[in-house]
């Protein structure tokens, strides 16, 4: 029985593994050189692999002995010949060396990928979380909604 490969699901799996291992090179291998990131943290946007590398190096180093487990839900994607757009809710859970969950947050992600030389690469990634209209606070947990 053959299985149909879903490039978006494969990228999410590789993304989760690279983050769990805190492997900067593996993480960056998912992205095209001309990546444009609209991230939730610190900057309005990041353009290119070098700023994204610096972000990843700083993030992974800040974790010390903690690891981050990324799980995806509500996954949807649309594939065209050499283009994929996908959407998901990501849960980032920090765990200690014994595997105990310390904290977590959710965020929404939209990813655009294109195929080059037989490989799918992310060329645009946008992450967000809703803002409560009354408190003007970011809602980092889906159960806050």
Model-predicted regions and their roles:
Residues 2-26, 36-145:
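A beta-strand edge to alpha-helix "cap/lid" segment located at domain peripheries
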């Amino acid at each position: 029985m053959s299985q149909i490969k879903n490039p978006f699901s494969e990228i999410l799996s590789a993304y989760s593994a690279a983050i769990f291992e805190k492997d900067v090179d593996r993480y960056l291998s998912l992205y095209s050189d001309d990546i444009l990131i609209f991230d939730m943290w610190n900057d309005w946007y990041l353009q290119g692999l070098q700023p994204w590398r610096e972000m990843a190096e700083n993030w992974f180093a800040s974790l010390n002995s903690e690891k981050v487990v990324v799980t995806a839900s509500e996954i949807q994607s649309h594939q065209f010949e050499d283009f994929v757009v996908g959407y998901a809710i990501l849960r980032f859970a920090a765990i200690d060396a014994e595997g105990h969950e310390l904290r977590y947050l959710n965020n929404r992600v939209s990813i655009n990928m294109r195929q080059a030389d037989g490989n799918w690469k992310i060329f645009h990634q946008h992450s967000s979380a809703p803002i409560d209209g009354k408190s003007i606070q970011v809602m980092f947990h889906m159960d806050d909604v």
